[in-house]
Amino acid sequence: MIDSKQKIAVLGAGSWGTALAALVARHDYPTILWGRDVRVIQSIDIQHQNFRYLPSIMLPQTLRATTDLAAAVSGADWILVAVPSYAFTETLCRLAPLLSIGVGVAWATKGFEPGSGRFLHEVAREILGGDVPLAVVTGPSFAKEVTLGLPTAVTVHGEDVCFTQMVANAMHGPMFRAYTGNDVIGAELGGAMKNVLAVAIGVADGMQLGMNARAGLITRGLNEMLRLSAVIGARPETLMGLAGLGDLVLTCTGDLSRNRRLGFALGRGQSLSDAIREIGQVIESVQTSDEVMRQAEQNGVELPISEAVRAVLREEITPYAGMKALLAREQKPEYLDILFKANCSL
């Protein structure tokens, strides 16, 4: 039974924040959505539509929206942050002095902190302190499909079991499954890397390289996820689940994926600036490719697909040159090490 006093504040009125706010509002949780754009907030609060990011989709009439951050978080039982990665640090800095004791913070932001390459849970812990319950929401989920009520499955990872379950319970419903776990690093890694890898698949599709190439890039991209996860302390099963493989497949094959659309445009010969302008929304891979490679270089892990994507997004090489370089790599064993080690205690 839902606690009638429980209130959820969602920070970020883009497509994903709006979708998640609408989801929990439909599950009868008192929900308020915060955003910066006055016109967007007014359209949500008055017309019950996000005219900019989710046009023509009706939102629950019980969903409230505001541009006042203090008003949004006042009395909230927990907070869900759904802003782009470049705004994550600033948003938490503004939130910290407004946060009441015992209020947990979850986020559906994917990526790393731009510039430092830090995982977002590291940023959150530093800004919010050690006593605030934290959790990350991730998995294969297009905002439009969630808002339309189409079947979706995500996973919520956090060290605080009670808070993690609270977040999952609010989201879980007839058309939305929310699983739980405690591998925050793995969950964040999958959500960040899939955006970079989706650009490579988009490029291949734009160049009309065929379904074989797409399948090969997705599989070898998953291998890159697993190899990096092995050296940073993430669990391979997390990357083989919704947070990794699930999100990777959706982002690499779905036409709603902005990162795939960016790669597709580049593969068709469009310039980076024109492609970004045409898509018209934040494309996480543009910054995340730098941070993924920063993690790889710091840990001595070779990520050829991610490295090629970074070079293309920096406009150091053409998409054609990037694909040619990947195909010209020397022959080698498919696996250089055991990715999954048997647990004899099971």
UniProtKB/Swiss-Prot annotation:
NADPH binds at residues 15-16, 36, 110, 143, 258, 282, 284. Pathway: Membrane lipid metabolism; glycerophospholipid metabolism. Signal peptide: none annotated. GO terms for biological process: carbohydrate metabolic process; glycerol-3-phosphate biosynthetic process; glycerol-3-phosphate catabolic process; glycerophospholipid biosynthetic process. It comes from Xylella fastidiosa (strain M12). It catalyses: sn-glycerol 3-phosphate + NAD(+) = dihydroxyacetone phosphate + NADH + H(+); sn-glycerol 3-phosphate + NADP(+) = dihydroxyacetone phosphate + NADPH + H(+). One of its GO terms (molecular function) is glycerol-3-phosphate dehydrogenase [NAD(P)+] activity. Its main location: cytoplasm. Its EC number is 1.1.1.94. InterPro entries: 6-PGluconate_DH-like_C_sf, 6PGD_dom2, G3P_DH_NAD-dep, G3P_DH_NAD-dep_C, G3P_DH_NAD-dep_N, NAD(P)-bd_dom_sf. Sn-glycerol 3-phosphate binds at residues 110, 139, 141, 194, 247, 257-259. SUPFAM superfamilies: 6-phosphogluconate dehydrogenase C-terminal domain-like, NAD(P)-binding Rossmann-fold domains. One of its GO terms (cellular component) is cytosol. Catalyzes the reduction of the glycolytic intermediate dihydroxyacetone phosphate (DHAP) to sn-glycerol 3-phosphate (G3P), the key precursor for phospholipid synthesis. This is Glycerol-3-phosphate dehydrogenase [NAD(P)+]. PROSITE patterns: NAD_G3PDH. Belongs to the NAD-dependent glycerol-3-phosphate dehydrogenase family. It holds the Pfam family NAD_Gly3P_dh_N. It is found in: Cytoplasm. It comes from the Bacteria.
